[in-house]
Amino acid sequence: MDILDLATSVDVGWTLVAAALVFFMQAGFAMVETGFTRAKNAGNIIMKNLMDFSLGTPIFWILGFGIMFGAASPFFGGFDFFADGVVGEGYDWTTLIFQTVFCATAATIVSGSMAERTKFSAYCIYSMVISAVIYPVSGHWIWGGGWLAELGFHDFAGSTAVHMVGGVAALVGAAILGPRIGKYTKDGKARAIPGHSLTLGALGCFILWFCWFGFNGGSTVALSGGGAEVASRVFVTTNMAAAVATVTVMCITWIRYKKPDVSMTLNGSLAGLVAITAGCDVVTPVGSAIIGICAGFAVVFGIEFVDQKLKVDDPVGAVGVHCINGALGTILIGLFAYYNGTEVEPLGVFYGGGFHFLGIQILGVVAVIAWVAITMTIVFNIIKHTIGLRVSEAEEIMGLDKPEHGLSSAYADFMPVVPTVLGTKAGETAAKIKDTAPVAVEKAVPVTKVTTEGSAAADGHKLSKVVIITKQSKFEVLKEALAGIGVSGMTVTNVIGCGVQKGAAEYYRGAEVDVTLLPKLKMEVVVSKVPVETVVEVVKKVLYTGHIGDGKIFVYDVENVIKVRTGAEGFDALQDDE
């Protein structure tokens, strides 16, 4: 093997590894979109992401690749079916698989913005159309030797070619589809509909961040001939923009919402990655940091604008992340471009390059927006007026997992878990309660006393039921504390609910949360021998922290208790007769 063959093998290997990383972005998108939507639609989201790639792969091979990389004209590549006449004529199989995973990325962006109310069949049709025609045509303009490429338009890894295409399609689709039931009040105020798992969303964000090194770094398609230097710079600028955008969004939401918003900050990471994708090879680390800051502002105010002003319901923020930041990142190259490969070529306005290059970038963005917006409007309206784009109201309320896929739940045997106190044995924590000072009356956990007529049992002993609502994490220590005063029988239920609290409003992705139902623990005990006052005092000591959410205690008079096995009633029914 000579040096040339070795270099070719290294370049191909590098590109194939990058293609595998880009493929794994599908898992990241699936996790982000699933986590940011409700559990009753989780299976449907997963299927849509799976079909984006599974339908897109053969469609892009049969039709899309020829349109994108054919040489028929500057506007349209040509109909080279099954990549025939394209692979082998300046392109190879490595390019085919690399562009296939890029095409799937553009397609999958739309599923999140149209989540929870789109027919699965309609979505499959959309996915095939964007993979066959929409993405390949604009891709030909940019990467296939088309008219934008001839003008000098620069989009290294796809801020416009991939992300903005998907983002514009997402905006058009969500607008035509309409908002989810309950998203907006009658006066048009946006309501927050929180996703069911920010943990899944965060996992997806980290997967995407990791895979983006292949998405951007692999776009060098070579390590030889200076490619290694460019790839190294791409890694640095990609990571820098994402990190700075994340911090920027955290700070903005901390100021605007009084707390750093988790879901919006996760979107901030993705926004930084999208924005830097076009110019990661030509900007300096300083330029990438500034782009990250711009992306942070754009995603927060962009998501709020789409949600609250345009009244377009985008459950995962795909429009703000991909459409707005795809366009922004592409245009900002005109300001910050400094390199051309391994050479310094300051084309950016801030480096004295003038406005010509900036104008080309703006022209390219506008042209692609127009192409995607017009064609996707036609596609979605055809689907809407033929097979239908949206599920029925009943199906939407039920959740799409059951009516679309026959899936009762994406989470088998799902139910809330009652955790123990982290890092502490229940007995140890209960022992500490004995040394706790009495709780001041004005700071105590609220106690409600409910009385009824004829509440004494037939034997004259007073019976009382104590109902405790508290955090699930308090279960073990509360159980141990009650056992310590002789209360061993109890009924425990996992519940969800909320209390009426005064204070600062809560926000989710910029929209105020009206009511948040939180997982709680409901513990019920009936006592007679143990004084109610003792039970209440112990419960107060266990639950009190001084913060909202400590819980509540309800005390009821009980008319009678009957033990079914023995027939014992009242006080005797509560005693251990073993």
Regions found by a protein language model. Give the residues of each.
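Glycine- and aromatic-enriched membrane alpha-helices
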Residues: 1-454
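Positively charged, small/polar-rich N-terminal and surface patches that mediate targeting and assembly
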Residues: 403-407, 421-578
